[in-house]
């Protein structure tokens, strides 16, 4: 497909996952370390993936357990904040996935 090569620069892109740590509202969110820790870990993973040569990155709320079919507002807001703060460092095409909630995923993507 021609569009794949146009978007990713290759016919067989490697899309890597950047799994975000538990965020505010999640049962396993570490309030002591706060959002700075979530952001720092996401930045570390993003840079490692890009330096490793991936063609794209997908951000996901992997550690927002348990997965919900309707994620909490603070999950979407936290993901938006993290991705927004990393935006200047993102060098490849990227996407978002709010696990089990396609509407929230689209809200973030737009």
How would you label these PLM feature ranges?
Residues 101-110:
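Catalytic cores of alpha/beta
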Residues 1-7:
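N-terminal carbohydrate-binding accessory modules
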Residues 2, 84, 107:
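Active-site phosphate/pyrophosphate- and oxyanion-stabilizing loops and adjacent acidic/basic residues
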């Amino acid at each position: 497909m021609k569009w794949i090569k146009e978007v990713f620069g290759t016919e067989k892109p490697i899309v890597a996952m950047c799994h975000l740590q538990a965020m505010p509202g999640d049962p396993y969110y570490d309030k002591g370390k706060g959002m700075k820790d979530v952001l720092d870990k996401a930045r570390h993973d993003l840079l490692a993936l890009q330096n490793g040569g991936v063609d794209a990155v997908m951000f996901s709320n992997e550690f927002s357990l348990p997965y919900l079919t309707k994620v909490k507002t603070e999950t979407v807001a936290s993901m938006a904040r993290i991705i927004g703060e990393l935006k200047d460092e993102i060098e490849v095409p990227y996407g978002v996935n709010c696990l089990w909630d396609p509407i929230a995923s689209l809200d973030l993507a737009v």
